[in-house]
From Swiss-Prot:
Name of the gene this protein is made from: aroC
UniProt organism field: Stutzerimonas stutzeri (strain A1501)
Subunit comment: Homotetramer.
Protein name, entry field: Chorismate synthase
Gene Ontology terms, MF aspect: chorismate synthase activity; FMN binding
Catalytic activity from the UniProt record: 5-O-(1-carboxyvinyl)-3-phosphoshikimate = chorismate + phosphate
Xref: HAMAP family: Chorismate_synth
Similarity comment: Belongs to the chorismate synthase family.
Pathway membership: Metabolic intermediate biosynthesis; chorismate biosynthesis; chorismate from D-erythrose 4-phosphate and phosphoenolpyruvate: step 7/7
């Protein structure tokens, strides 16, 4: 199966299925000498792992990562970094009833037509279980970016119809929703409790921000930084839309409002989301991603079987009623992977470029 590797100089390849024995990743291109420990990776994996609250799937996976190669005496060697996470809580029997059926809004139907067969257990390769390896790889990228003063972090900005105002980063790690507003957490909890009683699911919006990114990252035309970010973020399971900066709100803006004017003291706004002409401007890079409602719900849905006969499908098993609740670390990981890849590409081509024009921040 192609399409399992992302990046050009900093590359991430993942493999593994939801109910297989393990998930694996190969991270290649990480510069040598970076101090790296299991704790660096486990910290983000624990933020993503299932079963951490009543609002997520109750599948219990420790998601304990093993580093198989590429690290010696606590430092990266420059060789490929092999990573492994063992699956320990599969319940494949939950899916035996749907092995010949197609769940609505899942990848069952499309995988069947593409490959002629599919791993029906928990969605197989199409499951968001795969994103655990992205988070592990992204933790490596985040660690390297941090040595250059670049910080990547995210938060939930909307849960279903509830918009979440940004108040403080301090709140994000203090609740199960990654909400930046501590005051609205009870409302989010009540909404999810009712959703569970209704046996339904809901979507979410995640915002991810990179600060400290220098100007100059990104390539013209096809490898624009915003295009690469959209590619990476859209590759996350359940993501149906990506915005950079003001995004679709730009449609209603006038040019006098949308343009980010420059002054000697800094930019006056950041509607561009930190990217101009596909190249980073030095402002914070801001992206938003929309995740659809979970398709695995117990309410019967109309579908067909492999013979084309009409059936009603009820999805059993353990599922997230809102995949967006655990998506923040995944979005951070993908943004970090993109930024490190482009940082290394920029360094390879333009390391000798010197510009006397000052780097502007945002007022």
């Amino acid at each position: 199966m192609s399409g399992n590797t992302y990046g050009k100089l900093f590359t991430v390849t993942t493999a593994g299925e939801s109910h297989g024995p393990a998930l694996v990743a190969i991270v290649d291109g990480c510069p040598p000498g970076l101090e790296l420990s299991l704790d660096d990776l486990q910290r983000d994996l624990d933020r993503r792992k299932p079963g951490t609250s009543r609002h997520t799937t109750q599948r219990q996976e420790a998601d304990e990562v093993e580093i198989l190669s590429g690290v010696f005496e606590g430092r990266t060697t420059g060789c490929p970094i092999g990573l492994l996470i063992r699956n320990t809580d599969q319940k494949s029997k939950d899916y035996s009833a749907i092995k010949d059926l197609f769940r609505p809004a899942h990848a069952d139907y499309t995988y069947h037509h593409k490959y002629g067969l599919r791993d029906y257990r928990g969605g197989g390769r199409s499951s968001a279980r795969e994103t655990a390896m992205r988070v592990a790889a992204g933790a490596i990228a985040k660690k390297y970016l941090a040595t250059l003063g670049i910080q990547v972090r995210g938060y939930m900005s909307q849960l279903g119809p509830i918009e979440i105002p940004f108040k403080t980063w301090d709140s994000v790690e203090q609740n199960a929703f990654f909400s930046p507003d501590p005051d609205n957490v009870p409302e989010l909890e009540a909404y999810m409790d009712q959703l569970r009683r209704d046996q339904d699911s809901v979507g979410a919006k995640i915002t991810v921000v990179a600060e400290g990114v220098p100007p100059g990252l990104g390539e013209p035309i096809f490898d624009r930084l915003d295009a690469e970010l959209a590619h990476a973020l859209m590759s996350i399971n359940a993501v149906k839309g990506v915005e950079i900066g003001a995004g679709f709100a730009s449609v209603a803006q006038r040019g006098t409002e949308h343009r980010d004017e420059l002054t000697p003291q800094g930019f006056l706004s950041n509607n561009a989301g930190g990217i101009l002409g596909g190249i980073s401007s030095g402002q914070p890079i801001v992206a938003h991603l929309a995740l659809k409602p979970t398709s695995s719900i117990t309410t019967p849905g109309r579908s067909i079987d492999v013979n084309g006969e009409a059936v009603d499908v009820i999805t059993k098993g353990r599922h997230d009623p809102c995949v967006g609740i655990r998506a923040t670390p995944i979005a951070e990981a993908m943004m970090a992977i993109v930024l490190l890849d482009h940082l290394l590409r920029h360094r390879a081509q333009n390391a000798d470029v010197q510009v006397t024009t000052p780097v502007l921040g945002q007022l």
